[in-house]
A protein has these predicted regions:
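Helix N-cap/capping motif at the beta->alpha junctions
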Residues: 8-17, 38
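Conserved phosphotransfer cores of two-component systems
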Residues: 20-22, 44-52, 72
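C-terminal output helix
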Residues: 82-91
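Receiver (REC) domain active-site loop signature in two-component systems and cognate sites
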Residues: 33
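Two-component/phosphorelay signaling modules centered on CheY-like receiver
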Residues: 1-7
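Active-site beta3 strand of CheY-like receiver
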Residues: 22-28
Length: 97
């Protein structure tokens, strides 16, 4: 069983602040958040030089939503609800754990 250190952000602006302060290895970015949505937060993290994997999380599983996530700079996409085995598989995809 793997253990991970998790930082939470309640909105897109806070996600950017956490990225700058904590320098995580991966971001699971909810698309619908108050203050600033996850797509805009992803764009700004990429503009700041963030190259880490950013995985879009959304309740909308439409192709157009997936395309918007990739255009914003997300590396991958998961539709909610997120199941633990699928999340582990996603982490392993990027870190080979």
């Amino acid at each position: 069983r793997k253990e991970y250190e998790v930082y939470r952000a309640h909105d897109g602006q806070e996600a950017i602040e956490k990225f700058e302060g904590c320098r995580p290895d991966m971001i699971l970015m909810d698309i619908k958040m108050p203050v600033m949505d996850g797509l805009e937060a992803t764009r700004r993290i990429r503009l700041k030089g963030g190259t880490l994997p950013i995985i879009a999380l959304t309740a909308n599983a439409y192709d157009s939503d997936r395309d918007k996530a990739f255009e914003a700079g997300c590396d991958d996409y998961m539709a909610k609800p997120i199941m633990a085995p699928a999340l582990r598989e996603m982490i392993e995809k990027y870190f080979g754990e």
